[in-house]
Amino acid sequence: MEKPAIIIDQAFNMRSGFSGEEEPRSVLTCLVGRPKMTWGCGMECVDYFIGSEAEEKSGILIIKSPLEDDGHIDDFDDIEKIWETIYSKELTINPEEHSVLIAVPGDTKEIDREKIACIMMESFNIPNLYIANKHELIMVKEAKSDGIIFDSGEKVTSIIPIKEWKEIKGQGEVYKFGGKNVNEYLIKLLNHVNVCLTTREEKKIAEEIKKQMCYVALDYEAEINKKQDNEYVLPNGDKIKLKNTIYKTGEILFNPSLIGKEEEGFAKKCIDVIQKFDSIEDKKKLYSNIVLSGGNTLLKGFDKRFEKEIKGLVPAEMKENVNVIAKENRENSAWIGGSIYSSLPLMKDLWLTKDEYMEYGSEYANTKYQKK
C-alpha cells in the first residue's frame, strides 16, 4: 500500500504532517541555533539545535531563521537541517518512502524552486515532489475558486486575490507586519502597568496574555469609555491589572497610528487590492469571499471588526456583497489545503517524479508546474 505524502507548510511556524489528515502532526519553529563559542569535550558536542531546543538554549547560542520575514528561503543549508529534523524527530519517517508537497509563497523564484527540488530529490531521495502555492491551497481548504485571502502570520501579512483557483500575479500586496509586531506592542503596553518582559521566555508570557485576554473591540471609541476590570496571574503568582491593554493591543491592525505609522489599517488595504480590478463581477466575487487565514487573525473579535470596517469603507453598491469567512483552524489553512489537494486523483499527473528529475534535472520542476 502506498504511504501517504508529507505536507510541509513553509513558514516561521513550520507545519508538517500526512496527506489526508485534518491537521498537522507537528508545528516546528523555524530556527537554527549554533554555539557562540566552541564547547569543551566535557560537554555534548552538538553543532546546532533546531526549533524549541534552540530557543531553550538562547543564552549560549546564536539563533537565526533560514527563512526571510516573507517566508522565502534565505539559507538552504539550514532549511535542509529543518527538513531533516521534521523527518527524523517530528514525524520519525523514512523520507524515501513518502512523496512531499511543500507549500511556498506564490512569488517564490524559479531558482529557489529548483534548489528545493535538488535538496529533496538528492539529499532525501524522495520519490515525488510537488511545490504548491500556499495561497491557492488556502482556497482549496475553503472550497472557493474565487476570492481574496487575508493571510496574517507571525511576521508577514499577505492580501492575495484568487481567480479560478489561481493567484492573480502582481495584484496582491505583502506587508512585513504580523503577530510578532502585535506582541511587541503588547509588551510595550505591559511596561505601562509595570510588567517588564525582555527575555525570550518572558516574551512567551506576552503571547499567552494575548491569546487568553486580548481582543479587538468592535467599536474602539466606545471601548475607551468602559471600565476595565481585568486581572492576569503571572507564572510567579503575581497578579496584574491589564486595564486598556486587552483591547488596545490588536487595535494597531486597524489603526497603525497607535505605533506611529502614517498608513491605512488592514481593512482599507484589503479594499484597495479589490478596487484595482476593473470588472464589477470580479469585485463582487472578491468581496463575497474574503477569507481570513493565519494565526494573527485568531485574536478575539478580529473577524467581526474586520467585516464591520470593510462594510463601512466599501463603495455603497458593493456593501451587500461583503462576506468575511473566518473558519476554525485557520492558522493551519495552507497545510490543510495541501492535505486535501495531495489526496486528489489529479495529483498522479502533477508530481515531479524521481525519474523525471534524473532525466530532465531540477529545472523541470518549474516546467512541469507551469503545465498544471
Set out the residue ranges of the language-model regions:
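Conserved phosphate-binding/catalytic loops in two-lobed NTP-binding clefts
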Residues: 131-134, 307-339
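Phosphate-binding glycine-rich/basic clefts of nucleotide- and phosphate-handling proteins
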Residues: 163-262
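A short acidic Gly-Thr/Ser loop motif
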Residues: 6-13, 142-144, 149-158, 162-166, ...
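Conserved phosphate-binding catalytic cores of ATP/NTP-utilizing and phosphoryl-transfer enzymes
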Residues: 1-4, 112, 127-150, 166, ...
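Glycine-rich phosphate-binding loops at beta-strand->alpha-helix junctions
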Residues: 103-112, 214, 218, 288-309, ...
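Phosphate/ATP-binding catalytic cores across multiple sugar-kinase/actin-like superfamilies
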Residues: 81-90, 239, 248, 252-286, ...
